[in-house]
């Protein structure tokens, strides 16, 4: 994740940016033994995310970059990947997905 930390994207105000790498439609499905059984028809909604950036108005010590949290479904907003925003890549070319939410929407932290 150190590569992710260097991307030109940061949270503002009381918001937190979360990042995950969910399986996408078209990804190969592989069994535990390594057999390819097809391609995903539909992408997945991740259960867990990593805190990528914490806004300056989030109370100090609430969470830190790198903390693991469950995805606060229903409380998130999509954030385009910086490479997509800069016109360098298409969304399907990037596995990392970013979302933002208010810090109070984060249900738990795994530390």
UniProtKB/Swiss-Prot annotation:
GO terms for molecular function: ATP binding; protein folding chaperone. GO terms for biological process: viral capsid assembly. Homoheptamer. Forms a stable complex with groEL in the presence of ATP. InterPro entries: Chaperonin_GroES, Chaperonin_GroES_sf, GroES-like_sf, Phage_T4_Gp31_GroEL. This is Capsid assembly protein Gp31. Essential for proper capsid assembly. In absence of Gp31 the major capsid protein (Gp23) assembles into 'lumps'. Acts as a co-chaperonin with the host groEL protein. It comes from Enterobacteria phage T4. Pfam families: Cpn10 (PF00166). Keywords: Chaperone, Early protein, Viral capsid assembly, Viral release from host cell. The keyword Calcium does not apply.
């Amino acid at each position: 994740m150190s590569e992710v930390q260097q991307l030109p994207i940061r949270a503002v105000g009381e918001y937190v940016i979360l990042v995950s790498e969910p399986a996408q439609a078209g990804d190969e499905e592989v069994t535990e033994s390594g057999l390819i059984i097809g391609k995903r028809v539909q992408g997945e909604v991740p259960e867990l995310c990593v805190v990528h950036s914490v806004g300056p108005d989030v109370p100090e010590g609430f969470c830190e970059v790198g903390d693991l949290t469950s995805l606060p479904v229903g409380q998130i907003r999509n954030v385009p990947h910086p490479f997509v925003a800069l016109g360098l890549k298409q969304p399907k070319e990037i596995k990392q997905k970013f979302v933002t939410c208010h810090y109070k929407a984060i249900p738990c932290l795994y530390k």
